[in-house]
Amino acid sequence: MPLAEFNGKRPKVHPTAFVAPNATIIGDVEIGERSSVWYGTVIRADIAPVRIGRLTAVEDNCVVHGSRETIIGDEVIVGHAAVVHGCRIGNGAVIGTKAVVFSGAEIGERAIVAMGAVVLQDTKVEARTVVAGIPAKKIRELSDSEAKIITWGAQSYAELSQKYKEQNLE
């Protein structure tokens, strides 16, 4: 797993976290317990810190850039090829495949940003809502069953990543 120091700051990855061997993590990054960073993902904290909580999955080919302090909470799923740029993502949120979340945006707890949605700079997404479109707009509230699926998904990624670790695929 390529971890690179930048300006004297080296990434800190919890020993139970999984980082794919071709993911790149640069600078002032912290990755929490049982989280996973999948193939082709780049996490770059060369301007501001990036903090990723526990049981969070950053799926394949994502870009996370700390243009401002970037905080991704616990039990978050960042979908394939999503871009997360200088923002805050609350616990249990989902950022859909190829979605973009711009600088200063705040995604509430258990909110879902739909696939391909674009959350504009400084936008605030309420907790337990689903947003979609370009620009992203609220389309509905999150159901209790959907909230449970998010928790199940985060747990499933944590379990899968441990299988990768057991097979020395990091």
What are these regions (language model features)?
Residues 7-10, 17, 47, 68, ...:
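Solvent-exposed, flexible loop/coil residues
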Residues 50:
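Active-site cofactor/substrate anionic-group-binding motifs, chiefly glycine-
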Residues 2-12, 72-78, 82-83, 100, ...:
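C-terminal segments of enzyme domains that contribute to small-molecule binding surfaces
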Residues 15, 20-21, 26-27, 32-33, ...:
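Left-handed beta-helix
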